[in-house]
Amino acid sequence: MNKKILIIVPFPMTESQLSNRKEQSQKVTLNKSIDLHYQPVKAAPRTYVSQEDYLIADIGILEAGLNAKIQGYDAICVDTVSDSGVAVLRSVLEIPVIGPGRVMFLTALMLGEKFSIVTMWKEWFGLYHKTLTELNMHEKCSSIRSIDVIPDNRELLKGKESNIVPLLVEASKKCIEKDGADVICLGSTTMHQAHEILQKELSVPVINPGPLSYKTAETILSLNLSHSRKTYPKPKIPNHQMVFKMIEAAAINEKDKPLEKIEKDNI
């Protein structure tokens, strides 16, 4: 029997933009019984740089995944290294919910003693510190290096590879040679288009978080495992309708804003 995995994309976007995210499925070999379905959220923060952004992201992703089991999905992967919405979805769902951030950092320690995170933007450092703190893994992270390029969360690196990838290679080599990293972690699923070249250019493993999360979900499903209800207790009085109405209102508020420019506002 086929297993359906819902990939929640953390920004509203067009079908053309969504295709950039779907390319991640070509970077991993999954069992033929695994079907991936990509679904953008209806509303999201402009960027992921503040606690307000994190809260809005959690709510948007919660809304997108609340009915996943009813809709026939067997697992969820959240397409952001921030792991936004993962904990809250686990509290309301029985099916596995996988975040690429935690999966990436934990896998890095199976491949080496220490890892570094290479990312686009210093403004994202808070996301990594949050997860590293939750995992008590700061001592295992050799460094976090940024190339200081404002990310494009919808078009990703498309058309910009020749300018951006060399910067990522340079930053990664500094992580290895100066900081002592044994493994390089890509700081965002939006960087997946750079993975192949980075792996060819570097002497250590480079983890592509999105595809890794898909493979992890497949493995968890094959073992009939899911998250612990002791860690993620269900709400005593669920209020899903409040969440749906909040996001419905938020989506109306964002409706007339051009998707291609939404991240550039207020930066």
Where are these regions (language model features)?
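Periplasmic-binding protein-like
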Residues: 8, 70-80, 180-189
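C-terminal functional extensions of proteins
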Residues: 211, 215-216, 224-267
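Glycine-rich, highly charged phosphate/nucleotide-binding loops
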Residues: 51-67, 163-171
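N-terminal glycine-rich anion-binding loop in soluble enzyme alpha/beta folds
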Residues: 1-56, 122-159, 249, 255-261
